[in-house]
């Protein structure tokens, strides 16, 4: 199962994590050493991007402190998912949050799990989104369009 989240929201979340770990690594050498030792190199001063096909070219000249960097990363990651989606169950993050009970039922069915007695418990884990939309003006609109098209393709192929 692969959750697919709105690309700008997802990229903004990744950027927040990167900035969070930049601050933690600068403040506490133990955190940086610990994250290195356990192989968490996704964010902060230790950041090493996963080598998705075409990512190096996409990230050339991009700053990891920018939303565009993480949008490029999102596109490369989910292009890889799209190319290998056979056997994957794609699930819209937003649909899980807005209609947890229905989506939980569909997910359990897709996973061939008899969860009829636990459906309410399972669906309770998916909290509705706050009604407020966030604005992210600091990104390339054409990059957003590319990411949105991929997002729609993936969500359409999902449950």
PLM ranges: what are they?
Residues 19, 23-159:
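PAPS-dependent sulfotransferases, especially Golgi type II membrane carbohydrate sulfotransferases
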Residues 1-17:
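Conserved phosphate-donor/acceptor-positioning beta-strand/loop module used by diverse small-molecule
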